[in-house]
Amino acid sequence: LRIDGYLHPVEQCPVLTPEMTDSFKNIATKDLRHLRAQIDNGGGGDFALTFRGMARFRVAVYKQKGWFGMALRLIPRRILSFEDLFVTSHLIPRIKNMLDRPHGLILVTGPTGMGKTTTQATFVDYILESPRHVLTIEDPIEFVHDHKNGLITQREVGVDVSSFREAVMKGLRSNPNVILVAEIRDLATSEATIWAAESGHLVIGTLHTTNAPETITRFIDIFPPEIRDQIRIQFSMSLLAVFSQRLLLRAGGKGRVGCYEIMVATPAVRNLIRERKTEHLASAIQTSSSEGSISFDAYLAELFRAGKVTYETAIASAADPKGFRELVEFAQRNRQH
């Protein structure tokens, strides 16, 4: 089992044989006809599985050495609150205000397994407290949301629709206020995402990037070189914020806690994007803290001061270890005075 990012052997459990995993694969996919051929002939596939109404898993089936293996990730039953997610409580009203906007683009980014889906689920859960229609496009559907005071439509690529792009473009006809695109992975989806944000929708999307500057570069570079200048203009006008995140081991060794970099699209940030000066975005984040931006290391310092992570974990995770030390020492001197 992988617990808090590390693999742990399971004691007193029989070793799974290839025949057992193949049998489990057949049982798990018996109602997923669209996936059977892909898994059997293509060597793998991804889907969500609910077990007797008690637990829900994201399942990845893959082939190795001629036999099937599986990775099952437990999807939490409880959607986290903003207070659960963010140690920087003073930023929560700004984040909620962002999610109340009628249109624009919010990107949630980070490596695989770093909590992006959990953050998006919290965002969607908050939005549904108001009378708005939220359309989620996922592959597969992970968190299953209640309507609450709004309306939720959840579409799964490969089951309800053939692609992310098709889901976005056709989804516009279903009159959503908010569209969640669980993965922006290609040119067609990127184009549809920009179009949806420009046409009066709040769009929340995901990229597998580690920080805001890399996110901007990755998104723009998806497009052909001859139209990138125009895309920079459109993207800069639509962007509301980039949330980049990682999960760190909690102090005490049990559980993990999210560490965020938040870049709010201030006029200065929009101008840097248009002018192709992404190398200056890190400085723009530091100088726009009053607007709700926060650097990864500044957030890391907040986690350390709150006792959420140890100093050893913090210094090992810092983007700039030397700068992080100075940040912590400066805060300690201020408290003493």
Where are these regions (language model features)?
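Short, flexible helix-loop junctions that flank or precede catalytic/ligand sites
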Residues: 1-337
